[in-house]
Amino acid sequence: MRKIIHIDMDCYFAAVEMRDFPEYRGKPLAVGGSRVQRGVISTCNYEARKFGVRSAMATGYALKLCPDLILVPGRMQVYKEVSQQIRAIFSRYTELIEPLSLDEAYLDVSDCKLFKGSATLIAEAIRRDILAETGLTASAGVAPIKFLAKVASDLNKPNGQCVIPPDEVPEFVKSLSLRKIPGVGKVTAEKLSSLGLNTCADVQAYPKQELIARFGKFGAVLVERAHGIDDRGISVSRERKSVGVETTLAQDIYTLEQCQQVMPGLIQELSSRLGRSAKGRQIHKQVVKLKFNDFKQTTIEHRSDEVSVVMFYELLSQAMARQEGRGIRLLGVSVGLAESKDTLAPLMVRETKQLDFVF
């Protein structure tokens, strides 16, 4: 059984604006549109939603619902940069990441060994990291299948989490509204309702072949979802440019020796990830990253076409020279990957015999 997490940022664009401009906090705010030009709301905060304002709503109508609505233009470059921060956090826990947009993604953490493999605790850790490093809140859904993870992430918003364990899936889907199933929009929901089909339990009791006759391929998918079946895997379509491992330390550390004690576990996990997601790819650099307790960070890299364990330790020493007495709260190692067309040979590892562990 897989362990799927769906992360959904809370009113993302609006949340970034409230973070950067505290004067907006506690007031109805929407991103997009203008008081003088026609437009559409991209997103709005929860204060605006109390008045009925929603995403994709015409700005003029939103202002009728909430005359005091604050409208701000979108800052897409900022939203993209923060989204990259968030995805970097995801990559600490798994390489199986399927971004759906700037503010949501599926993660398959089935092979993650952190927190003894508990997807619940992993989701909590991801949300903590996002809050600590971006100042934004995220909601999470945890389930053994994708569509239920997405459903679950919406149940305890904002800044909440919902877990649907495998043994609770059959009971959970029975009462689930068909409107919650991806692909069931307003028109389809009305057609289903005209047949007396409003919940998954209704579909379970309905003749499968009749649904397929009425709705075609979607009818078959609907039957599967209504029974808690979703065989879709995580779609990682883009070619990876790097593979890395980071760990946020339980307590700040201060010495090179303490950092060296953390390195073997990171390098071992990096080796595993390279084998899973970059087999046969040529590397072109090695990188060590430190984040300090003032949340500033430094990276040191070295161009190389072979993975050298000793080089990671040399880069660590160079990074520590920039410490300036600060505590270290995060340590990471990574390699940059050459494009597939540049792949000349399998990844090679050298100098491991000088160190007493397996790479």
Curated annotation (Swiss-Prot):
Q: Which SUPFAM superfamilies match?
A: DNA/RNA polymerases, Lesion bypass DNA polymerase (Y-family), little finger domain
- The answer to keyword DNA damage applying to this record is yes
Keywords (alphabetical) are:
Cytoplasm, DNA damage, DNA repair, DNA replication, DNA-binding, DNA-directed DNA polymerase, Magnesium, Metal-binding, Mutator protein, Nucleotidyltransferase, Transferase
Q: Which GO terms describe its molecular function?
A: damaged DNA binding; DNA-directed DNA polymerase activity; magnesium ion binding
Question: What cofactor does this chain's UniProt record say it requires?
Answer: Mg(2+)
Q: What is its EC number?
A: 2.7.7.7
* Name of the featured protein: DNA polymerase IV
Source organism per entry reads Shewanella sp. (strain MR-7)
Q: What is the lineage of its organism?
A: Bacteria, Pseudomonadati, Pseudomonadota, Gammaproteobacteria, Alteromonadales
